[in-house]
Amino acid sequence: MVLETERLILREYTWQDFDALYALLSDPVTMQHYPKPYDEAGTKRWIDWSLQNYQKYGFGWWAMVLKETGEFIGDCGITMQRIDGQLLPEIGYHIDKAYWRQGYGKEAAKAVRDWAFTHTKLDALYSYMTAGNVASYSTAAAAGLKKVKEYEDPEDGPLYVYAITRVEWKELQVSEGEQGLF
């Protein structure tokens, strides 16, 4: 599975990505909206879970690399997440702090959104984040998702849920003048 955008390649994880992913997930600034940064065991579980998801669902976290250099700068993809008690397909993204505020999250999230609605039968996509994660909900909104819910999680505190339906995505394709595969 490979997705290409103007500046990025999104591809399935391999075990060769461990060191770069560990550097990303263990960074306290990058992971400030998680309960804690990941250790080596958590990073191994991240890759293993991604590999399992590719087999089970046909999607998962995808490594994000710069098209020009091949440098790993984060990940973006779809995972099944428990959101306020429901198992839902979530678009998520994690970007190395050196690449924040350059539009990579938006670019990747839009590509993953378009891939999901053209290659799966999913009726909606979700994104959820802590209420203080402005970058995450800004990225979700830039990808066409709208805030649909707020709820209190016992471990993470207040969370926001953003979503886009297949119908809304089709309307967005028309309004953006894009040629989507309907």
Model regions: which residues?
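A short helix-loop-beta-strand connector motif used in the catalytic cores of GNAT acetyltransferases and
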Residues: 50-63
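Secondary-structure boundary/capping residues
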Residues: 30, 39, 56-59, 125
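Acyl-donor (CoA/ACP) binding surface of acyl/acetyltransferases
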Residues: 1-32, 65-182
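Conserved GNAT-fold acetyl-CoA-binding loop/helix
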Residues: 29-49
